[in-house]
A protein has these predicted regions:
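Short, solvent-exposed beta-strand/turn "edge" segments of beta-rich domains on protein surfaces
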Residues: 28-29, 76-81, 207-215
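Bacterial Sec-dependent N-terminal signal peptides
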Residues: 1-28
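Beta-strand-rich binding/interaction modules
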Residues: 116, 213-252
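Accessory beta-strand-rich segments of carbohydrate-active enzymes
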Residues: 32, 44, 81-197, 227, ...
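A short, compositionally biased domain-edge/stem linker segment
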Residues: 18-27, 89, 133, 203-209
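Surface beta-strand/loop "capping" patches
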Residues: 187-227
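Residue-level detector of high-confidence beta-strand sites
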Residues: 43, 63, 123, 250-251
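Accessory carbohydrate-binding/adhesion or oligomerization-edge regions at the termini
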Residues: 20-77, 150, 154-159, 175-185
Length: 252
């Protein structure tokens, strides 16, 4: 049964407990770096997401990347504000077949369409917020997968900043200009707040209803989703960790 649950905990921690150390177990998710081995083409390409497209002449790039960056810019209309394509090949081992697989983009300027193996997965508008492309049921387990991203930096009145460059007093560079990661989890998982798009929710939401000089009380709401076709029995274990990795409070 596909559903979600929100688990709430109150953690009370005392400032004097900061010296306590404790090992932290695995979170049950894998995060893979997707910043390398991209191919880039500045300009539009007809059916640029096709798996059989010849991209041998494209430029090899690593992310973060800007579609055009010259030695200096002086004056409007000197930054590229057109279309660009990015492509990346990858294979996944069969051990991930029963997992949830998403690609997390921290930022693409300005609008983009994301494809896997020639099929559109999602689109995103605006370069200042991250987003997630869910690949779970689209992976080719027998060969190469092609992740393709069509990026548009053309002025769009509906997407900030919403004006052509000669109408603004700052530059906004185009492309996949922030990190990209693949996140692999079980089908029962703590959600991604950007994917869920819930006000003050999704993932883990922390508030501090009581804070004094000597102690503080933290409220944790954990958003868990079940993508299996069965009810699941589970527990959520939360820890509050300081900058040195010491666990100062925990709850289950």
């Amino acid at each position: 049964m596909k559903h979600y649950r929100i688990f709430s905990f109150i953690l009370l921690f005392i400032c004097a407990a900061f010296g306590q150390s404790c090992s932290i177990s695995s979170s049950g998710r894998e995060v893979l770096d997707m910043n390398t081995d991209w191919a880039f083409y500045r300009g539009d390409v007809v059916e640029g997401s096709r798996t059989d497209l010849d991209d041998s002449g494209w430029i090899p790039v690593a992310l973060p990347h800007i579609m055009q960056l010259e030695m200096k810019h002086c004056g409007g209309n000197s930054i590229y504000d057109g279309i660009g394509w990015y492509r990346r090949y990858f294979k996944l081992p069969a051990k991930y077949k029963d997992k949830r697989i998403v690609v997390s983009f921290e930022g693409v300027m300005t609008n983009c369409d994301v494809y896997l193996n020639g099929q559109k997965v999602t689109e995103h508008h605006g370069g200042y917020m991250g987003f997630v492309a869910d690949l779970t049921d689209r992976i080719d387990w027998n060969g190469n997968n092609v992740l393709a991203v069509r990026v548009s930096a053309e002025p769009d009145p509906l997407t900030p900043p919403g004006k052509p460059q000669d109408k603004m007093d700052f530059y906004y560079y185009s492309g996949i200009y922030r990190d990209v990661r693949m996140v692999i989890t079980d089908k029962v998982y703590i959600t991604d707040p950007l994917q869920e798009d819930i006000v003050a929710g999704g993932g883990q939401f922390v508030t501090y209803p009581e804070v004094t000089k000597d102690k503080a009380r933290a409220h944790l709401a954990t958003h868990v989703r079940n993508l299996t076709d069965k009810d699941q029995t589970l527990s959520v274990f939360s820890q509050l960790v300081d900058s040195a990795g010491h666990v100062i409070a925990e709850a289950e």
